Amino acid sequence: MAATPTHFSVSHDPFSSTSLLNLQTQAIFGPNHSLKTTQLRIPASFRRKATNLQVMASGKTPGLTQEANGVAIDRQNNTDVFDDMKQRFLAFKKLKYMDDFEHYKNLADAQAPKFLVIACADSRVCPSAVLGFQPGDAFTVRNIANLVPPYESGPTETKAALEFSVNTLNVENILVIGHSRCGGIQALMKMEDEGDSRSFIHNWVVVGKKAKESTKAVASNLHFDHQCQHCEKASINHSLERLLGYPWIEEKVRQGSLSLHGGYYNFVDCTFEKWTVDYAASRGKKKEGSGIAVKDRSVWS
Amino acid sequence: MSTESYEDAIKRLGELLSKKSDLGNVAAAKIKKLTDELEELDSNKLDAVERIKSGFLHFKTNNYEKNPTLYNSLAKSQTPKFLVFACADSRVSPSHILNFQLGEAFIVRNIANMVPPYDKTKHSNVGAALEYPITVLNVENILVIGHSCCGGIKGLMAIEDNTAPTKTEFIENWIQICAPAKNRIKQDCKDLSFEDQCTNCEKEAVNVSLGNLLSYPFVRERVVKNKLAIRGAHYDFVKGTFDLWELDFKTTPAFALS
């Protein structure tokens, strides 16, 4: 191979012409030349390679290309992100927005979602993707570990969303979705001292401490991972019970104009378990303080 | 709202009709209509559940089962590059608008996509939602997306100053986080229509949130070291546009004056 192994390794790359063009452009216009002005759109995965190649081409040894990874974000990367966002949005506009323009036009006037969804902020459990909600279907709140604070206390973020969706939008269903391998629930289960306020995460997940207590009461002999899974589900029921503590939610559930559902998405085996709160049966239980009764449980797989 | 049970209501109706039998036809028509409505309500509920079931099975067949490598990896851990704050509004799911695939973005959604300033007790909710992706998952980008026709911002703009709290106690308590945006718009844009003021406030509120992000020490230190980029955006679904901008925050090296 010749004196510039970089170029030859590029040529074995199926996208070589693209990367090569990038390098040449860089050489002509200097290292600060922005990728934005090249005519060719260079996919993100190959931008990273191109950056590596640039370092290699500058005469440093291949070993030093390792340093190129994990380096602080520089201005060039920022331009990449803008470009990436732009492509993403234009794809949405072309493939979805323009195709369904009438629907979007109606939505612009008002939304009338049938669902309020409370889900975790975890990147793997987006309700739109996993349950196919389209724009206009579901008013969606996402927080750490899909927790619902009690009516009487706690941060107002989730509570404001409950107020708006139930009292103004008049949603007919509330769906609380928990999931497998939840970092928030894990943090809750690992917490030793509930007064530990060193971190925000602890300050927040302590909202779910009743779920942890009920889990420890029945599952403390299980492996920690299984305890966490138990707590993930217990926490959903605990949140549903908390929802009934909001007077205007309980009123609507009692009248039959609002239903409360729990959902558990297991992304390890891709199953979705769903159940509905049986309000009539729960009323008796509520007096004993022992949780809620459920019905219509099913598992989709 | 009446707390009378339906049995009491039917009993009362029966008593009335036995006294005034000429109301029989009217009653029959109304009862039929009510029964039809109740049946539809019930089937709507069934439809709602069927809807999400078919949504899930569609996802499983067309996405999950076609990308086993991706989903096996995600089952073990997540490495999202983005932390996104978006409104809970049903029309603005970031996965739709920006086509985020599962695993790409940690997404927090609340009323009017707000980030309050650092407060360990009052705002532990958002604090946790920042702390986890930034300090544990090491996301590289934060994106706060505002949008058109935002009910939360409209509510903020409509609050009269110095009035007693209304029945929307939680909403008002939450949206006043962006009161600085409202105050600025009321001053700078007082000649614009209420609607235009709201649009400006939607964007200004994003800027207030971007500023509030810097009140979190773990955010600020990463921004200064260039390990974390902060951007704001505004999605206008009336016009079909998306504006994107960046928060530029850095300290320059000091130079000695003496």
Swiss-Prot record, chain A:
Transit peptide: 1-56
Main location, first listed in the record: plastid
Entry GO CC: chloroplast
Keywords: Chloroplast, Lyase, Phosphoprotein, Plastid, S-nitrosylation, Transit peptide, Zinc
EC number, UniProt record: 4.2.1.1
Highest taxon listed in the record's lineage: Eukaryota
GO BP term, pick one: carbon utilization
SMART domains given in the database record: Pro_CA
Tissue expression: Strongly expressed in aerial tissues including leaves, stems, flowers and siliques.
Annotated GO MF terms: carbonate dehydratase activity; zinc ion binding
Residue positions, PTM Phosphoserine: 128
Phosphothreonine found at: 65
Signal peptide: none
Reactions catalysed: hydrogencarbonate + H(+) = CO2 + H2O
CDD domains: beta_CA_cladeB (cd00884)
Alphabetical list of Pfam families matching this protein: Pro_CA
Entry keyword annotation includes Phosphoprotein: yes
Subcellular locations according to the entry: Plastid, Chloroplast
Top-level EC class: lyase
Modified residues (S-nitrosocysteine): 231
Matches recorded under PANTHER family: BETA CARBONIC ANHYDRASE 5, CHLOROPLASTIC, CARBONIC ANHYDRASE
Family: Belongs to the beta-class carbonic anhydrase family.
Function of the protein: Reversible hydration of carbon dioxide.
Protein's recorded name: Beta carbonic anhydrase 5, chloroplastic
Organism for this UniProt entry: Arabidopsis thaliana
Species classification: Eukaryota, Viridiplantae, Streptophyta, Embryophyta, Tracheophyta
Gene name linked to the record: BCA5
From Swiss-Prot, chain B:
EC number from the UniProt entry: 4.2.1.1
Family: Belongs to the beta-class carbonic anhydrase family.
Protein name: Beta carbonic anhydrase 3
Residues modified as Phosphothreonine: 35
Cysteine disulfide links: none
Major location (coarse): cytoplasm
Catalytic activity: hydrogencarbonate + H(+) = CO2 + H2O
Function: Reversible hydration of carbon dioxide.
GO cellular component: cytosol
